Each structure stands twice: as structure tokens, then as C-alpha cells.
Amino acid sequence: GFLDSFKNAMIGVAKSAGKTALNTLACKIDKTC
């Protein structure tokens, strides 16, 4: 239902945000960007 799709959307946003944060962190650490 609505709550399931909302939860899935939140998980998707959290995953992409986490991935972006990890990439930024890795970039700062080993200067690969």
C-alpha cells in the first residue's frame, strides 16, 4: 500500500544519499576524483 511505497522511496533516497556521501569521503581520502 501507500506506506510500503513510501518506505521503499525513503530507502531508495537513503541509499543514494549514502552512496554519494561514501564517494565524497573516498574522494577526500585517496584523491581519486
Swiss-Prot record:
User: Is Transferase one of the keywords UniProt gives this record?
Assistant: no
Q: Which InterPro entries match?
A: Antimicrobial_frog_2 (IPR012521)
- GO terms for CC? extracellular region
Question: Where does it live in the cell?
Answer: Secreted
Tissue expression summary: Expressed by the skin glands.
Q: What are the protein's UniProt keywords?
A: Amphibian defense peptide, Antibiotic, Antimicrobial, Disulfide bond, Secreted
Keyword Oxidoreductase attached: no
Q: Which GO terms describe its biological process?
A: defense response to bacterium
Which Cys residues form disulphide pairs?
27-33
UniProt similarity note: Belongs to the frog skin active peptide (FSAP) family. Brevinin subfamily.
- What is this protein's function per UniProt? Has antibacterial activity against the Gram-positive bacterium S.aureus ATCC 25923 and the Gram-negative bacterium E.coli ATCC 25726.
Q: What is this protein called?
A: Brevinin-2PTd
